[in-house]
């Protein structure tokens, strides 16, 4: 039976004019801002460098879509909000995307991209992480005095029978438990893990690898490791002490800690009774868990509010005022939570629906690489602007999703962007900044 697809649509009259619509406009794209993503990529040389080092098991005589094209097609698609491989069966003919990845013919289909993702392995994951660190080092003109490495894990909900799927009691769902490492807003690690392990599993090894490479580049640099109480494990603490790495890591409260902190807890309670306002009192105690090799300094934050007592503890090997260390250094790790939220919410890091383990690790890395492009666009192109602190989804909506008519011939490709775009001046500023240097 013949199925007819409607190509023209009628809408209610406006100002005595008939309104008609149809998908017959030719080369028109909603992704005119792809040029900014491409420019950020060229600035970093991200995909060009990765493509030179990533393995490609395909027969070179039969390759239609080069590895760098596949990488760009997937990353640029994620930046523009296309998380599903099926989207590329339509996008492969989009002139805007073709231009961004520097191809004139149809791009790879969803099945080609799927085969590519399922061919990923441990070596590919290692090379991407290595590329992140090398790029991070290369982007520093001068050696930094201090680097703060933030560790955190998050849940990646699962709805199928993926390899490594386990039920997690805390999150109350089947999920993966990826580990992220950030230095400021720069992503240095995105490591997929099953959820049937300790939240700190592999953290020590990853920190050791990062510290070793960073100190090769900058021997005098001071390195600080931050994490919540899930990462307070003797192996990590002992390694940091032995290698002159500073740390501020949350410590779960217990009866011994509460007993040691009792003077400050009572002081906060007394002050609250007198003022009826939230009180915080800070102190430092020496504490050693049974599994630790020695006692360590622990910051006590004795807080009392209208809801009662709320003591918190942070183990440190730094000197300084307890309140300053807690407020100015430890609490600053909360900004990392926003960066982690951007991974699934803005760049679809939770799209780990492949059956194979390494294919899902590869998807997590692709989202991380897309974040690297968006972070560069924000850090370089949007510094000091109204979008300087905007999340990836906001940047996409206001600067990347711009309607454009495309005219392509043998000499040039013209993007005729929407004249009514409200961010034209900002767009021009970003172009100039990404083109400089």
Predicted regions and their residues:
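Dynamic "connector" segments at or just before major functional cores
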Residues: 1-173, 177-198, 202-217, 378, ...
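Acidic/histidine-rich, metal-coordinating catalytic segments
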Residues: 152, 220-231
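Short, surface-exposed basic-aromatic patches at helix termini and helix-loop junctions that form
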Residues: 237-246
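An anionic, glycine-rich sequence signature occurring as long contiguous blocks
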Residues: 3-23, 246-348, 404, 430-437
